[in-house]
């Protein structure tokens, strides 16, 4: 066998290109391995290739959802994120009209909002009022104002605690009440959450003032769980405003020590002297001039207004209906979500306003104020009546006096040498303060003269009486004389009537 010995020759240009390609290839592999991503995944991430989706069109009764598409976007209103709007209701007929007024003015696309109501343990016409308001909302001519899917559930949980402010917020009722409310929330959330929901929003029905952009305002923070600050208005005599929701807080050393000292089934509730936790509360962090975008990390949260990504509930977080780390319901939901490495955030300067509900003491004070108002009105009415009587019975002569004063006071001007004659007597008695010679007599001299005249008259009367009694000299009379003179015309008898 013969071999042809040929000398191999390489084109320098070819070698240069090959070297460049090899260098690029190895560098690319090095970069991709550093970021633990394959070339195929990189191309897919850039949108050139779409993930594999099986085709179930020809398979009846099969629905396919890729849950990667429902993670919750911070601009969900632009991405078409659907929101599950959960509302627990109990004896809420008087609050539903206000609630639907807020609902109808929300700026989040209504067709992306699915409403889910749970009516439980109600004794009023909550269901009837709910149906009538839903009919009005869904019959609007502007179809963009109509909401998406609407579900109504009815289930009682044996709630026997009253709905008054004092009943619901009494210390002794807090533990059992929170656990029952947690059961209701879990029941509603478990049956209402659908695979296509990206967000879940919990709202109390008795919120009085809330921004129409509440969904967008909370959503754009892109947090797993987020709540606003909640305050309430008060009457003037109670201070105008007050923090309402104290269930949103950050853990403190005092809270941990208190939890360690309590029984396993105990439930810590905020705002009561029995449980002093010294925790920083979201409500008290509010600054009226603060930035509404400011965030505060929380451990426990309140349930008035909660926006959470649907994945939080899908992965197992819920509202514990038992004592979880000595808390229950929404506060325990916050702690549980933190344990699952979800971020829980509050907005201290972004405020919504709960309605004012008077306590038993407030109602007593309001009754006293009503009675006091009646008393003041009656007192004012009587005062006006007596003022009218005074005006009628007593003539105001001040204007007349101002007119006559000058003409009266001119008589005391000594330069005029006026001889003044003043009649100090009562009108018509005929006496004057001028003597028989026409000279002026002072009131004191006149009084002395009158006394002398009276004494003279008395003496004359005594003399006349003495003359009539037969004693012109004024000699004192004994008893016999008095008896004799008592009957001067007595005639003596000629016989003695005592003799027989």
Curated annotation (Swiss-Prot):
Membrane topology, as annotated: Single-pass type II membrane protein
Gene Ontology cellular component terms for the protein in this record: endoplasmic reticulum membrane; Golgi cis cisterna; mannan polymerase complex
One example of a Gene Ontology biological process annotation: protein N-linked glycosylation
Keyword Electron transport attributed: no
Residue intervals passing through the bilayer: 16-27
UniProt cross-references to SUPFAM superfamilies, sorted A to Z: Nucleotide-diphospho-sugar transferases
Stretches in topological domain Lumenal: 28-500
Keywords: Endoplasmic reticulum, Golgi apparatus, Membrane, Signal-anchor, Transmembrane, Transmembrane helix
One Pfam family here: Anp1
Key word Membrane present: yes
Compositionally biased region (Low complexity): 446-467
GO molecular function per UniProt: alpha-1,6-mannosyltransferase activity
Region (Disordered) location: 424-500
Superkingdom of the source species: Eukaryota
Cytoplasmic side: 1-15
Ranges of biased composition (kind: Basic and acidic residues): 489-500
Entry's localization field: Endoplasmic reticulum membrane; Golgi apparatus membrane
Subunit details: Component of the M-Pol II complex composed of ANP1, MNN9, MNN10, MNN11 and HOC1.
Record's function text: Involved in the organization of the secretory pathway. Required to maintain a functional Golgi apparatus.
Family: Belongs to the ANP1/MMN9/VAN1 family.
Name of the protein in its database record: Mannan polymerase II complex ANP1 subunit
Native organism: Saccharomyces cerevisiae (strain ATCC 204508 / S288c)
Record gene name: ANP1
């Amino acid at each position: 066998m013969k071999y042809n010995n040929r000398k191999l020759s390489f084109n320098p240009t070819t070698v240069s290109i090959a070297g460049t390609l090899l260098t690029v290839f190895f560098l690319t592999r090095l970069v991709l391995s550093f970021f633990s991503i394959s070339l195929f995944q990189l191309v897919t991430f850039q949108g050139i290739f779409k993930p594999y989706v099986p085709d179930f069109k020809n398979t009846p009764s099969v629905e396919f959802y890729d849950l990667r598409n429902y993670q919750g976007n911070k601009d969900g209103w632009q991405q078409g994120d659907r929101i599950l709007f959960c509302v627990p209701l109990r004896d809420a007929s008087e609050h539903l009209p206000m609630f639907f007024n807020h609902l109808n003015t929300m700026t989040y696309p209504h067709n992306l909002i699915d409403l889910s109501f749970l009516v439980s343990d109600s004794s009023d016409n909550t269901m009837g009022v709910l149906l009538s308001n839903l009919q009005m909302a869904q019959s609007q001519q502007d179809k963009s104002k109509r909401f998406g899917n609407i579900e109504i559930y009815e289930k009682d949980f044996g709630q026997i605690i009253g709905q008054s402010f004092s009943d619901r917020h009494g210390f002794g009722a807090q533990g059992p009440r929170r656990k029952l409310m947690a059961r209701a929330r879990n029941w509603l959330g478990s049956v209402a959450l659908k695979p296509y929901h990206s967000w879940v929003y919990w709202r109390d029905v008795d919120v009085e003032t809330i921004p129409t952009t509440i969904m967008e305002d909370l959503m754009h923070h892109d947090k797993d769980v987020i709540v606003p600050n909640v305050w309430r208005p008060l009457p003037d005599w109670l201070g105008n405003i007050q923090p309402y929701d104290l269930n949103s807080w950050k853990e403190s050393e005092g809270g941990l020590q208190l939890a360690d000292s309590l029984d396993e089934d105990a439930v810590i509730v905020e705002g009561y002297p029995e449980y002093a936790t010294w925790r920083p509360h979201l409500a008290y962090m509010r600054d009226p001039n603060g930035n509404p975008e400011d965030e505060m990390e929380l451990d426990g949260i309140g349930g008035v207004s909660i926006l959470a990504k649907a994945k939080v509930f899908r992965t197992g977080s819920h509202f514990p209906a038992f004592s979880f780390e000595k808390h229950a319901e929404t506060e325990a939901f916050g702690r549980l979500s933190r344990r699952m490495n979800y971020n829980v955030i509050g907005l201290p300067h972004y405020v919504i306003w709960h309605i004012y509900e008077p306590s038993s003491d407030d109602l007593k004070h309001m009754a006293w104020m009503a009675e006091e108002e009646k008393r003041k009105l009656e007192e004012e009415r009587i005062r006006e009546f007596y003022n009218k009587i005074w005006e009628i019975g007593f003539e105001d002569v001040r204007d007349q006096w101002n007119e006559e004063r000058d003409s009266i006071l001119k008589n005391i001007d000594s330069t005029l040498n006026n001889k003044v004659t003043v009649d100090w007597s009562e009108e018509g008695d005929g006496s004057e303060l001028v003597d028989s010679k026409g000279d002026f007599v002072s009131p004191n001299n006149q009084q002395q003269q009158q006394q002398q005249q009276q004494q003279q008259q008395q003496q004359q009367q005594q003399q006349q009486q003495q003359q009539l009694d037969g004693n012109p000299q004024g000699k004192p009379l004994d008893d016999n004389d008095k008896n004799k003179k008592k009957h001067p015309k007595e005639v003596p008898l000629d016989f003695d009537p005592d003799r027989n």
